[in-house]
């Protein structure tokens, strides 16, 4: 992302930290003078005469951007499919892949399901930005065994995310183009004969 904030963000500075689009809401609202909006939204926040009680998976980047702290506030990033499945996660330099698309192509790959891996793949995105390590060297799987410790913070990050569903369950299921999913939805709504 590119950011210009005269007098706050140092010109020509570069950060390799992770920022998601949903981080813009808490960051911009905080910059406008309303800090902690994410916590306020969880307990019920009134704006423009309406009360919003919702959990948004965004992080306020203002303390990091202003130099108030050197610690980035986002612990990691989850990658989702358009069906709502957690495909992978990013944790610092590492990407941990739980499901992958084996089909190659454009729309053709979208027509085929993801493969759920029995053991996650691990990539160091600083040294392997194109994620080729699993297909090029003979020592890739030895490397996974040496980096098993990454599964602990991965489990915590995913667990913390899933924990939010207790108080804030998903509002809707992801749309599907699968015929069986569409038929199930029609049958559960009582619209089929």
Predicted regions and their residues:
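C-terminal cap/loop subdomain of S1 sulfatases and analogous C-terminal strand-loop tails that border
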Residues: 8-13, 17, 22-132
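Long, internal low-complexity/basic segments
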Residues: 96-97, 102-103, 111-121, 125-193
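A structural signal for alpha-helix termini and helix-coil/disorder junctions
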Residues: 5, 34, 67, 160-167
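Catalytic cores of eukaryotic secretory-pathway lumenal/extracellular enzymes that build
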Residues: 2-3, 119
């Amino acid at each position: 992302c590119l950011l210009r904030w005269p007098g706050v963000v140092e010109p020509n500075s570069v950060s390799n930290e992770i920022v998601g689009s949903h981080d813009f809401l808490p960051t911009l609202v905080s910059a406008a003078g309303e800090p902690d909006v994410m916590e306020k939204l969880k307990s019920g926040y009134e704006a423009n005469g309406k009360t919003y009680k919702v959990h948004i998976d965004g992080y306020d980047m203002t303390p990091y951007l202003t130099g108030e702290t050197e610690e980035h506030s986002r612990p990691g990033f989850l990658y989702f499919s358009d069906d709502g499945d957690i495909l992978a996660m990013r944790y610092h330099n590492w990407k941990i892949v739980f499901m992958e698309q084996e089909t190659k192509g454009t729309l053709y790959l979208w027509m085929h399901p993801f493969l759920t891996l029995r053991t996650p793949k691990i990539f160091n995105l600083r040294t392997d930005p194109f994620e080729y390590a699993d297909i090029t060297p003979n020592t890739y799987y030895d490397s996974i065994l040496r980096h098993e410790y990454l599964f602990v913070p991965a489990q915590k990050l995913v667990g913390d995310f899933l924990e939010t569903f207790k108080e804030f369950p998903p509002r809707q299921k992801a749309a599907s183009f699968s015929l069986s999913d569409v038929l199930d939805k029609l049958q559960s709504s009582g619209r089929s004969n």
